[in-house]
Amino acid sequence: MEYAAIHHQPFSTDAYSYDGRTVHIKIRTKKGDADHIRFIWGDPYEYNDGKWSANEQPMRKIAATEMHDYWFAEVVPPFRRLQYAFVVTDDHEDIFFGSSGVCPYNEKTLETIHYYFKFPFVHEADTFQAPEWVKSTVWYQIFPERFANGREDLSPKNALPWGSKDPDVNDFFGGDLQGIVDKLDYLEDLGVNGIYLTPIFSAPSNHKYDTLDYFSIDPHFGDPELFRTLVSQLHQRGMRIMLDAVFNHIGSASPQWQDVVKNGDQSRYKDWFHIHSFPVTDDNYDRFAFTADMPKLNTANPEVQKYLLDIALYWIREFDIDGWRLDVANEVDHVFWKTFRQAVSTEKPDVYILGEIWHSAEPWLRGDEFHAAMNYPFTEPMIEYFADQTISASRMAHRVNAHLMNGMKQANEVMFNLLDSHDTKRLLTRCRNDEKKARALLAFMFAQTGSPCIYYGTEIGLNGENDPLCRKCMVWEKEKQNQDMLQFMKRLIALRKQENTLLTEGHLEWNLLDDKNDFISFSRTLDEKILIYFFNQGNVVQHVSLRELNIDRNKKICDAWTEQPLQHHDVIAVQPGEFLILSAAAPV
């Protein structure tokens, strides 16, 4: 047994409160090392005849990567206090693993109380909690300038005819909020129930990430009453809306920055920014990346903090928005985000806080900052396997597992899963315009825990390279839309919503990772219900024998996509590039 590979970190995603009473425990071992692990636990104050009263239960192996196995236990301490350790067993020995590391497994070790990990008290206030509605939300991301032109009188004077060319960086086409209002029937029919808008506040650019005034709607998009109408109509349809907050930086045309440019170190706003010297030049202040027109805000400054918090609360109080997506969230200090979380959650307890973070987001997902991050690290291995074909099926599965093991279960359940956005190549382009691959990838992503999002136009086959080509105008002429893709997305979204509880909370198990033939199978299970997925990314037909799946004969099996009943002895062909979803459940 390789002792150095055994890892458990208390007070982390390895040991946390799931719901204010239940504690989730994980431990990692070298892959294939441990035969089984026993979890030893009890109340630190409970003794019987002078001996600590301990409970023992087996742990379940829930995931594996190329190097490690992950084991899981769930306990409900009756007095909310927990003292615990692990007994790891292989072919040759039992070892005790606790706060002092690896120890011999014997009576003396078991009775040495300071060798045990502690979870002093399970506080509900310390429990990561996210809005329940997010678990049942399918998001649709809209880049407002390119979605629909509902009022030509709002369009910039230099706006080009809608969809007349592929966009350049500085082009305008006249998309606005009225265009979104006009298309709500379309969005409802598609099945999405959450709308994420990139910035809508006053700004000179088409993307609006260079904010002029956070308290006003950009005049080319509309006005407060039009936005109020949009929010009201969304809520009437049972749909949610999330806005984009750019609090890392502000636009260089903003009055605050212009005051600094004009007045230098005499400006009342000089401490709002990270300025190295005066007067301001092109290279003596911090900005987003190296973008001169996006000076970075100093969020440690109390005036800046109040300004930004007032903005966040204003749009909640005045318009009842449901969420904030936070741009460049990883470059803003944790102290500010903790204050932000407290302020907005106090104002609206079920508001959703989403951070734009392109790497592991665990430091922001501990319950006192964000509810979720844009889950690029989770979906990137899926894209690399299905679209790029640069990694194997097993490598993809291992990376997916590693990402899930790095998070708390309730955080994974509300993560923002996406395959493309305004910052990436479009999905179809990433798939080299192979629609089968795009469909398989979407079906795969929609089968995972988390809140799925599609980027506007994906459902009708819109393609596009990186920015600005990923920000094309939406196509509204039906004859120019891919209607087969549209019907596919409607069915995929409907299936996700139908099986939402299972796909959000259910256990993921990989059944088959055939790297040679590019054939994958995994299952999602919750209670007595199971969905079994098969993806054939190879070049030959694969056959699935239902008899060999050993499904309980009391359960009814059907093709979850077509809802066609199946028999336990059926054999189903999965064509190259296609997928199969089986549903098995006890008869109602």
Swiss-Prot record:
The record marks 423 as: Transition state stabilizer. The lineage of its organism: Bacteria, Bacillati, Bacillota, Bacilli, Bacillales. Ca(2+) binds at residues 149, 155, 174, 176. Hydrolyzes beta-cyclodextrin to maltose and glucose, soluble starch to maltose and glucose, and pullulan to panose with trace amounts of maltose and glucose. It is also able to hydrolyze acarbose. Can also exhibit a transglycosylation activity transferring glucose or maltose to another moiety of sugars by forming alpha-(1,6)- and alpha-(1,3)-glycosidic linkages upon the hydrolysis of substrate at concentrations of 5% or higher. Its cofactor is Ca(2+). Keywords: Calcium, Carbohydrate metabolism, Cytoplasm, Glycosidase, Hydrolase, Metal-binding. GO terms for biological process: carbohydrate metabolic process. Substrate binds at residues 249, 325, 422-423, 467, 471. Binds 1 Ca(2+) ion per subunit. GO terms for cellular component: cytoplasm. Belongs to the glycosyl hydrolase 13 family. BbmA subfamily. It holds the Pfam family Alpha-amylase. The gene is bbmA. This is Intracellular maltogenic amylase.
